[in-house]
Amino acid sequence: MQNSTLYPTVYVLGNGQLGRMLRYAGAPLDIYVEPLAFNAPVFDLPENAIITAEIERWEKTPLTELLGNHKNFVNQHIFGLLADRFTQKSLLDELNLSTSPWCLLKDKNQWNDLFQTVGEKVVVKRRTGGYDGRGQWIIRDENRADITDDLFGEVIAEKFIPFDYEVSIVGARFKNGEKRFYPVTHNLQQNGILRYSVVDCAFPQQSVQQKQAETMLGKIMDKLGYVGVMAMECFVVGDKLLINELAPRVHNSGHWTQLGCSISQFELHLRALLNLPTPELQTFAPSVMINLIGTNHNPKWLNIPFAQLHWYGKEVRIGRKVGHINLSHPNKAVIIQQLEKLCTELPEDYQSGLNWAIEKLK
C-alpha cells in the first residue's frame, strides 16, 4: 500500500466519483487518499489514519464497522444526524435558521391539519435515503393515497415553496473554528437532479446572499463542531434564503472549483481534515459546471476551448451521473461561445439547461 512521506493516509468510505476526485486532489500535496467500497476486505488500519466519507449513509459491513470504530473518523456522528431529514430539519429549527415549514408525518389523521397549516400542496420526503429526486412526492388532497401506510413515520412533509431560483454554498471549517467559503452558486435542477451550476460574483444580490449564506452555514458548522467541507442548498424567495438540504461532504455544486478557484473543494476538504495552512479562497473567473447524466462519452467534448472534462469511468445508465464538464474564463462572452458549441455536442435534453446557463451569464 502506498504511503505519504508527510501525512497519514486518508481513507474515504465509498469509492464513487467523489472519493476518486478526493484522491486526485491529494496527490500534488503528497496526501494519499484511498477510497474504499463498503464490501472491501478488512485490513490493518493504521492508528494515525484519517477517516472521511463521500456519502451520508452506508450499509453495515465488516469494513464499515472497522472504520466506524476508529478514533479518527472525522464527523462520524454528524453523518447520521444530517442523513435523517427529521433530525436535520430539527437542527435548523433549533438554530432558528430559515427553512420551509415542515412536520414529521406520523399517520394519515394529520392530512387535514397539514393542508390547513402548511398549504394545499406539500412535499413529502423520506427521512433517510432518497436523493436526486428519488423518495419524494408532491402531494395534494386528491393524491394523498400515494403516501402508503408503510411510509408514515418514515417521511417528513414540507410546504411546497414556489421559489425564484435555487442556490448553494460550499464552505469548510477547520479544527480551530476558522472557515473558508466559495461564492454562492446558482443551480438548475431537472427532475430532482442537479444539471448545471453557474458562478459569477457579479450576479445581482450576490453580496447580500453571500453574507446571509456564510452566516447560516457557519452557524451550522460551529454548532456541530464540524471539520471539513459542507454544502448547503437553498431556495431563493425574494431577498431571503430558505435552507433546503445540507450535505456533510464535498458536493456536486462545488465541482466548478476544480477549474475556477485557487483551491478546489476536494483539496480544501483534505486540508481541513489534516489541519493544513490554507489561505483565503480566490475565485479566478465566472464558471459553469454541466453534469453529464446518462450520456455516452463524446471525444468531441475535448475540443471545446477552456473546458475541463471529468469522466467517472462508470457504466452509462439512464439518470446516472457519469461525468461533468467545467468551463471558466474571465470573459463571460467566451464561456457563452463554448456553451453554444456544446449545444451541438450534447443530446437534445441538455439544450434548455445550456440556454439557462447562457442567459445567466448575459
Curated annotation (Swiss-Prot):
Subunit description: Homodimer.
Q: Which residues form the ATP-grasp domain?
A: 89-274
* GO annotation (BP), single: 'de novo' IMP biosynthetic process
HAMAP family to which the protein is assigned, alphabetical: PurK
Q: Name one GO cellular component term.
A: cytosol
One Pfam family from the record: PurK_C
**Which species is this UniProt entry from?**
Haemophilus influenzae (strain ATCC 51907 / DSM 11121 / KW20 / Rd)
User: What's one GO MF term for it?
Assistant: 5-(carboxyamino)imidazole ribonucleotide synthase activity
Q: Which domain of life is it from?
A: Bacteria
Q: Pathway, according to UniProt?
A: Purine metabolism; IMP biosynthesis via de novo pathway; 5-amino-1-(5-phospho-D-ribosyl)imidazole-4-carboxylate from 5-amino-1-(5-phospho-D-ribosyl)imidazole (N5-CAIR route): step 1/2
**InterPro entries assigned to the protein according to its UniProt record, in alphabetical order:** ATP-grasp (IPR011761), ATP-grasp_carboxylate-amine (IPR003135), ATP_grasp_subdomain_1 (IPR013815), PreATP-grasp_dom_sf (IPR016185), PurK (IPR005875), PurK_C (IPR040686), Rudment_hybrid_motif (IPR011054)
Q: Which family does it belong to?
A: Belongs to the PurK/PurT family.
Q: List the disulfide bonds.
A: none
Reaction(s) the record says it catalyses: 5-amino-1-(5-phospho-beta-D-ribosyl)imidazole + hydrogencarbonate + ATP = 5-carboxyamino-1-(5-phospho-D-ribosyl)imidazole + ADP + phosphate + 2 H(+)
Keywords, alphabetical = ATP-binding, Ligase, Nucleotide-binding, Purine biosynthesis
Q: What is its EC number?
A: 6.3.4.18
What role is this protein assigned? Answer: Catalyzes the ATP-dependent conversion of 5-aminoimidazole ribonucleotide (AIR) and HCO(3)(-) to N5-carboxyaminoimidazole ribonucleotide (N5-CAIR).
Protein name in the entry: N5-carboxyaminoimidazole ribonucleotide synthase
Q: Does the keyword Zinc apply?
A: no
Binding positions for ATP per the UniProt entry: 85, 125, 130-136, 158-161, 166, 244-245
